[in-house]
């Protein structure tokens, strides 16, 4: 057999394997092969700690969070983003010089204890580029050194300022940031602050107690989040407050008065059951709501390099630009 024939055979075999794996991924999980690969990657890279180690790690988290957050250098954002100090909080503003009266306030996730990951920044960079709107990314106060009350105070002030200067404002948040975004909007009802034109929630953490009995059915397929670890971080954020306080668990808050809510949630994450409850609560409250169910998707699938994330990004852009 000639060398070129061997190479051709290897290439064809490789393509056949890829095709078979793609078909299997579609049949078994109803998702792309890349999404299945990402889930495997997450299983091996996302650590689930012993609860004792989580508590011991608080001191390290405080040291990290006390340092000034630095945007990932490989995303080359230095000329595109302005960094400002907003009432003692680090704030990044994308498209600051653009002549637009539309703005996005994005509240990142991280279990209320971690700073934004590379994927967060890459995602908001895409949003800023594709919309051309001003995009605000606050590095809000984190547990265990700070609690939800401090974050609510500074974020409410920031939102009110953004709201007063723009005709259209879109509030977005992922995971813990999604729960915080929803809780903020519920507090706006009480404080008579104008609602965002659209509230966009990506896999929001909306009940920090994680006491929903149905969650246990999703533990085996969840590659990222540990129920026990996440509960500890949530209690640190609560700092002694009742866990059913809507500012911590907006699933229990008043939804009557919210304007328009969009929920993106994967079916292979422990937060899925609570988000289905939230969707039904919003329907019962006569709130305009749309549920984007990511079949076979993992936590905050929107930020990963998979075909489903590209579809979800287009859906987000359609919401914002309609």
Model-predicted segments: where are they?
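Alpha/beta-hydrolase superfamily serine-hydrolase fold, recognizing
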Residues: 16, 24, 28, 82, ...
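A glycine/proline-hinged amphipathic helix-loop "lid/cap" segment
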Residues: 2-96
């Amino acid at each position: 057999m000639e060398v070129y024939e061997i190479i051709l055979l290897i290439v064809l075999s490789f393509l056949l394997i890829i095709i078979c794996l793609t078909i299997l991924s579609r049949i078994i999980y109803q998702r792309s092969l890349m999404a299945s690969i990402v889930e495997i990657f997450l299983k091996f890279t996302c650590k689930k700690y012993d609860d004792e180690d989580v508590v011991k790690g608080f001191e390290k988290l405080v040291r990290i969070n006390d340092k000034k957050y630095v945007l990932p250098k490989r995303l080359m954002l230095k000329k595109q983003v302005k960094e400002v100090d907003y009432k003692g909080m680090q704030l990044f503003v994308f498209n600051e010089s653009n002549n637009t009266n539309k703005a996005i306030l994005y509240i990142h996730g991280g279990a209320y204890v971690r700073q934004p990951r590379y994927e967060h920044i890459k995602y908001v960079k895409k949003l800023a580029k594709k919309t051309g709107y001003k995009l605000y990314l606050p590095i809000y106060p984190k547990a265990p050194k700070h609690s939800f009350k401090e974050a609510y105070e500074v974020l409410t002030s920031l939102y009110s300022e953004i709201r007063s200067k723009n005709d259209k404002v879109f509030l977005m948040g992922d995971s813990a940031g999604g729960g915080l975004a929803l809780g903020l909007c519920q507090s706006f009802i009480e404080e008579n602050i104008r609602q965002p034109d659209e509230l966009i929630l990506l896999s929001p953490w909306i009940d920090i107690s994680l006491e929903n009995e149905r969650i246990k059915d999703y533990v085996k397929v969840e590659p990222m989040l540990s129920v026990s670890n996440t509960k500890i971080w949530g209690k640190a954020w609560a700092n002694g407050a009742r866990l059913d306080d809507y500012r911590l668990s907006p699933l229990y808050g008043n939804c009557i008065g919210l304007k328009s809510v969009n929920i993106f949630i994967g079916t292979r994450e422990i937060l899925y059951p609570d988000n289905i409850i939230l969707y039904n609560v919003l329907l019962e409250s006569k709130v305009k709501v749309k549920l984007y169910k990511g079949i076979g998707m993992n936590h905050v699938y929107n930020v990963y390099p998979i075909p489903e994330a590209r579809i979800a990004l287009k859906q987000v852009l359609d919401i914002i630009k309609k």
